[in-house]
From Swiss-Prot:
This is Ribonuclease R. Disulfide bonds: none annotated. The gene is rnr. Belongs to the RNR ribonuclease family. RNase R subfamily. Residues 207-527 form the RNB domain. It comes from Chlamydia pneumoniae. The lineage of its organism: Bacteria, Pseudomonadati, Chlamydiota, Chlamydiia, Chlamydiales.
Amino acid sequence: MLKKPKRKPGRRTYGKSLKIFIPGTLFVHARKGFGFVSPDNPEEYPFDIFVPARDLRGALDGDHVIVSVLPYPRDGQKLKGTISEVLARGKTTLVGTITSLVSPTSALAYTSMSGSQSLIPVELLPGRTYKIGDRILLSTPPWVDKPQEGASPALQMLEFIGHITNAKADFQAIQAEYNLAEEFPPEVIEEASLFSQKHITQVLHSRKDLRDLLCFTIDSSTARDFDDAISLTYDHNNNYILGVHIADVSHYVTPHSHLDKEAAKRCNSTYFPGKVIPMLPSALSDNLCSLKPNVDRLAVSVFMTFTKSGHLSDYQIFRSVIRSKYRMTYDEVDNIIEKKHSHPLSKILNEMATLSKKFSDIREERGCIRFVLPSVTMSLDNLQEPVALIENHQTFSHKLIEEFMLKANEVVAYHISHQGVSLPFRSHEPPNDENLLAFQELAKNMGFDITFTPTQEPDYQYLLQTTSAGHPLEQVLHSQFVRSMKTASYSTENKGHYGLKLDYYTHFTSPIRRYIDLIVHRLLFNPLSIDQTHLEIIVRACSTKERVSAKAENSFENLKKTRFINKFLQEQPKTTYHAYIITANHEGLSFVVTEFCHEGFIAAAELPKEYSLKKNALPESIPDKMKPGASIKVTIDSVNLLTQKIVWSIATTTEDKPKKIKKTPSKKKGTKKRAS
């Protein structure tokens, strides 16, 4: 239950300083300790507020807080704030790792959610012998405005999770850390079981029968929930008619049902290597809603007519029943398009490839940037230990599906908006000038020139294209540009989509795994089913839960990656690794280790003397070997699994070259996160 804030949101004057008090949700960086507050009212405060670790004041990741901000930072500093009050804890439990034992019933533990490297006193449950490295579930402490001098109160242990050396317990720890429920309540399972294949037959008369239409799915080889199928036909003028057929989840998950309430609570599915926490029970997600081949399935079909040049001329949206003819994988489609294999779909797939290329060219013409970001798939053994990092590559089949889904999302957003109905847009606002200037400076220091468009705007599209297709700094530069941009989110206000350069955009194509898409389906056919106030609540909840799931997925990957790097330290302690510098300043050196797709940092005090920099060193005074993009060699000094801290150092002598640590880079194992 929310408590009444002691400090009301708004402006307050303290001496000569005007402070703004803004309510929002706190997100704490699990490894670096700082946080960001996402304001409750993004229309009034359309930015996240940076909070240094020292200014969290006992606030934890996920807390609903009030942050105080000085609106006019001094000396060009970034806008940052201090937590003034915690209105409500975001979690009732924390996960801690014992780092030292004080007595048989008390210990000190590390928890990443506090945003601090300091250790927390813990009162242990009796009846067990504990060891350093034990992971335990703890009760969240109440927030105290002005904590008393002296030691922090001990947190109560609730449950034993497992020792840090037990990789099988990683999932349970992350699940508890982010409060992700895997099991569904009995009433939800029971409600899902009421539907069967017979139910589809009973509603055929009320739908467009498309069971004879040649349509099929394209997904990863491991996918089980097939949201979308595609088709391609032609009209009498030989214009393209692209069909995108999406599982009609809204037919089964009706407003205020048990299924609906649980889906609204989860907001989305969360994906881990070899495992998923679904938004819907498997009876729906893997069965009745999944567009499996050669079975009747209920769908929402979007038929879009495109001219020979690839421009939209007409569209239709209606409920249908389809029967997918093939379940294709990305690899199969790539082989067919590259003419390595013959297949009954060869002709239509090549025609789809032609249309997809037209869409891609149009996107490029309007200034849309296609990013190449570092991404790996983690391969785990039966003990859940990482055995390989497999580099992902987006192939043509991925781009084909991406282009088709983007078109469907755009058309649906345009359609609902022009019906005069409020909807959840997928918004992506332009970066602020400060971040863009910082990126321009970074690119310049890496040796790149920023050209300008005819309207005298910096041509980031051209810059990033010149670093694509295997450029050694491709992933570094693209990653830094993405970081300069704002995070995409949901909003009932249409702010456009900067990354896609679209005026209308929403999420419609993945209702099995995203609650927003389910809401959009409802608005298509029953626009009065959701009032504005309720829609605003849904939009905020889905934006927040999306970030929570992303953090959980990243935390799991980082933990496994730490295990993987530790394995190489134990087996190859003298190995040097190739890295590229990201930033260099008086605080230290940050870099990306390409072999592990991992960002590291070496504090200034630990750097060789020739790598030291003065506090206000000008970019032109930085030696070439320390400039962003410069190549360096690093070694692993130590790995602390308890805190997931990896200590690196500059390689000063010729060391062993790294042995092969990856399998042959694979084609991207399809991800469910298709649309931006």
